[in-house]
Amino acid sequence: MTYRDAGVDIDAGNALVERIKPLVKRSFRPEVMGGLGGFGALFDLSGKYKEPVLVSGTDGVGTKLKLAQQLGRHDTIGIDLVGMCVNDVLVQGAEPLFFLDYFATGKLDIDTAAAVVGGIARGCELSGCALIGGETAEMPDMYPPGEYDLAGFTVGAVEKSQLLDGAQVREGDVLIGIASSGPHSNGYSLIRKIYERAGAPADLVLDDGVALIDALMAPTALYVKPILALLKSHGEAIHAMAHVTGGGLTENIIRVIPDGLGLDIDATAWILPPVFAWLQREGAVADAEMWRTFNCGIGFVLVAAPAQAAALEQALDAQSLAHWRIGQVVTAQGDERVRIG
């Protein structure tokens, strides 16, 4: 009896590595030492930072993965995986340096795995982050046929003096919301239930002319390069940042706001994108549930000094990033620290 007889095909794993090597190498940075296949991946941090603080992050894509598998759309879910991780470390002002992925399945399908890892490599390339390693685990009997799971891990760095931890946030600071590309990778357990119960036709088109399926599967926006450029040119104006993920607008921005302060968010400052309007209508989802489940069109938030907010907005315009002033920092009123109205 062989390992292949037991359900693990080492040759398929090796073939996958050869297939993805060119894609992975396109994401490499000069600091990457060596190639693929070592027991550990190497990254040279010397020379670039005076007092580097390493910032780590790990995440998955939730049950958006189920929808991707249901629809056979494997080429962009890897971008989602990268976005969920690198956008998180970006919040503290860190530049993502390198990324590792974990792909697990019951039986390895080389084409599917290559499409997924290709998306991861593309996401890393778009974020200036090197895909320096990963693990492909073929585990018979652990997953149903055709299913796989994903996890991502990233490490970034920021100068200690430039670390953003929310300590500078003051009452009166302005909230500048930057547009999301869609639901990103959060709320998909609810999204899938609404989608199934609505019985929407496969070719349903939303009010903005985008097919519903395309809107639901739009890759998570990658904010790294434009925000790092903004930090370099207008860093003194940014007191904190937030990545709007699980918990939506209600629970994410407040994570970077000091005790004693709260948020007053103006829900009329931007128009709810059609994909979220469809979800709310078809699912009969209450406003409060929308705010704490989805990003509702705001994927990333800058907490800015009011006197410099206009300059930040001009810089965002120059980078063609859609944005709105969505509220301000206020004194907290009792236990209610976030008001959306």
Curated annotation (Swiss-Prot):
It catalyses: 2-formamido-N(1)-(5-O-phospho-beta-D-ribosyl)acetamidine + ATP = 5-amino-1-(5-phospho-beta-D-ribosyl)imidazole + ADP + phosphate + H(+). Its EC number is 6.3.3.1. It is found in: Cytoplasm. It comes from the Bacteria. GO terms for biological process: 'de novo' IMP biosynthetic process; adenine biosynthetic process. Signal peptide: none annotated. Its main location: cytoplasm. One of its GO terms (molecular function) is phosphoribosylamine-glycine ligase activity. GO terms for cellular component: cytosol. Keywords: ATP-binding, Cytoplasm, Ligase, Nucleotide-binding, Purine biosynthesis. Pathway: Purine metabolism; IMP biosynthesis via de novo pathway; 5-amino-1-(5-phospho-D-ribosyl)imidazole from N(2)-formyl-N(1)-(5-phospho-D-ribosyl)glycinamide: step 2/2. Belongs to the AIR synthase family. This is Phosphoribosylformylglycinamidine cyclo-ligase. It comes from Xanthomonas campestris pv. campestris (strain B100).
